[in-house]
Amino acid sequence: MIRKPGQLIAVMLVNSLALVMVCRAQNGWTSSQVSSGGRDLNAVSFADSKRGWVAGDSGFLAYTEDGGSSWIERPLGIDRSINDIYFPTRERGFVLAGGSIFESSDGGHIWHEAHKFSPAEFDGATPELYSLRFNGKKRGWVVGSASRGDIVVNSIVAITRDSGETWQVLQVPTKQELIHIDFVDDRRGWIVGAGGAILHTDDAGETWVRQNSETNATLYHIDFRNEKQGWAVGERGTILRTEDGGQTWRSIVSPARSTLLSVQFVSEDDGWIVGRGGTILRSGDRGKTWLEQESGTKQNLYALFVDKKIGWAVGSRGLILKYQR
């Protein structure tokens, strides 16, 4: 159940310019297209207003150091889709692709495969990792699913206590596909996934219990501002809200019926959601009500990264939207 790090393959990356065409501005959102070869972008992460990363299908990975005016591709040498990119610090970053965790310690210039989960750990089923979080230098968690063909046969929740040197697969109270994880402090965290699954820990991810979401909709993303206040989004326009740490979840009326894929709050009041069909929603009252924003696109938006001044949304065929107050 505990594996040593996977084969270390240092990737000395050669810069290749990923050109950007700025198209239009709509209601504060500027649309551009990164030259991804038509590949979808599944993840976005920014260290500050200038330096950020996007990642997507067939191993596409690119970074910017000028606030998105230009992007430079950093090939990992893989053809698997990248599902998540996460920088817990400015220099230390992680990428998830298939059953592998890639790590960088120099701000994303050089990457190596730090760990690879094996089908043998899941009774021969193929692992796919979707979301990773660290809290401090040593303790981290990754979630996903194990499948045979197109059928998910088990969930994946794994923990590291030694900065990713080893990972232990945990037993959790669901076999559903698990898609996103969020921690609000060093002990309390939540996971969401298929079938309305919401899991919660209050012991730093050692054990997990299931919370009642009151829905069977697949939940794709969860965001907590503190130990009480959180939101989850999913298919068919599902928006859930809690004010008691997930002991109770309330369904919120959504102005969109499309699948919602990412939610993030920049303060206790101000939050954003993106989803399929170019959907962008915004709330200014702690997520009690939501208004649809004009995105200027009908393409799917798969991931979101926002702070108090700047926001980014990425999606189909290299689409990047930037919001600036």
Question: Where are the language model's segments positioned?
Answer:
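Bacterial N-terminal signal peptides that target proteins for export
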Residues: 2-12
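Residue-level hotspots at or immediately adjacent to binding/recognition sites across diverse folds
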Residues: 23-325
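Bacterial N-terminal signal peptides
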Residues: 10-20
